[in-house]
Structures are given as structure tokens and as C-alpha cells.
Amino acid sequence: EAVRITRELMRIDTSNYGDGSGPTERPAAEYVVGELREVGIAATIIESKPGRASVVVRIAGGDRRRGGLVVHGHLDVVPANPADWSVDPFSAVERDGMIWGRGAVDMKSMDAMMLANLRRIAREAIIPPRDLVFAFFADEEQGGVLGADWLVSHHPALFDGCTEAISEVGGYSITLPVAGSNQTRRAYLLQTAEKGLVWVHLRATG
């Protein structure tokens, strides 16, 4: 199911150009809500601006005294120039056992896994040990101003009681040789820092 959802989400162009000219996240948000409603989960689209849509769903846990866990992804993607690709970046072609296209790694695949797990929770009437908040944000690729940042500022109650959060899978594993053998080992890198931004004004006299 996660593969199906990944491919269907990838075929929805949600390129974020940073200037408001993109197709917006609304179609992807509507897709998410449709997949949830199909299994009886009520979900609402929340817009920071017309078209800049996010979806947040809370699943009640068995012990409401425990801090809730936020599992979040983003629906927008970095723009893709078809001339730079060997496949249509929004076709979600399945080839060589992999799905090719924009969003396969960053991060519609995780969005799909979140959705698939939500659908399973609903179908099997699973009650998690603590509250789970699943969030599908807009605007991550341009700083989250119209997505996560806006929701936390304008709808903080959506995240009441949450104490941890996990997210971003915009990376990939690497294959490393095993010393003294012909074997290889797959390594999954762990991020220990986050990129930042600093403005520097330089003046040089020649």
C-alpha cells in the first residue's frame, strides 16, 4: 500500500518555487484527506494562504498522561527541470526495483508510509500507547513559514501535550566495503546537526 500511495503522491506536482508561483500543496492535501476518510479517519485541510495546505490528524493513545509523539512530513517538493532527468520527474516510474521521480526520497515516500500506517491503525482499530499526531505540512522546502511555523503559531492546540517529534527522511543509505573481505555493508547516516543561514556583509578596499 505504501508503494501505491508513494507513486500517487509523486504524480501530484507540488513544486515549491518560493515565490507563490507553484501549483501549491492543496491537491496533495486533498489526496491525503481522501485516503484517510476512506478508512473512517476525519481529517481537515488547514490553509495558511489559499492553496498552501497542511493536514494534521491526532490518534488518541491508551495513556493520555504520556506525552504525544508528532510524526510529520511535508507535501511540497523542490522544483524539477525535466531536461535534467532521464524520466519524467512526476511520473513515479518503477524501474530496477525503485521508484524514480521528484519526491521519492524527499519526502513523499515517508508521507506514504505515514498514510499507510494511519490506514492500518483505522482498519485494525489499533490504540497506540500514547497520542500520535500525524502532520503533513506545506512549505517545508522554503523554510516552513506557510506550513509548520504557521500552524504552530496559529493552531498550537493541534500539538497540545506533544513532547517529541520525528520527521525528515530527505537522505539515503550508502554502501561501504567491509574491511578484509569482498562484502559490502549498507550504512544509514544519522544527522547530528541542521543547516542554518548567516548573512555576512563584506567591504573590501582595493
Describe the residue ranges of each PLM region.
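Polar, glycine-rich mid-to-C-terminal structural blocks
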Residues: V200, T205-G206
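Acidic/His- and Gly-rich active-site-bordering loop/insert found
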Residues: E1-A104, R123-R130
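Acidic/histidine-rich catalytic neighborhood of metal-dependent amide-processing enzymes
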Residues: V105-T192
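Short, histidine-centered active-site or binding-site loop motifs used for metal coordination
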Residues: D13-N16, A138, G206
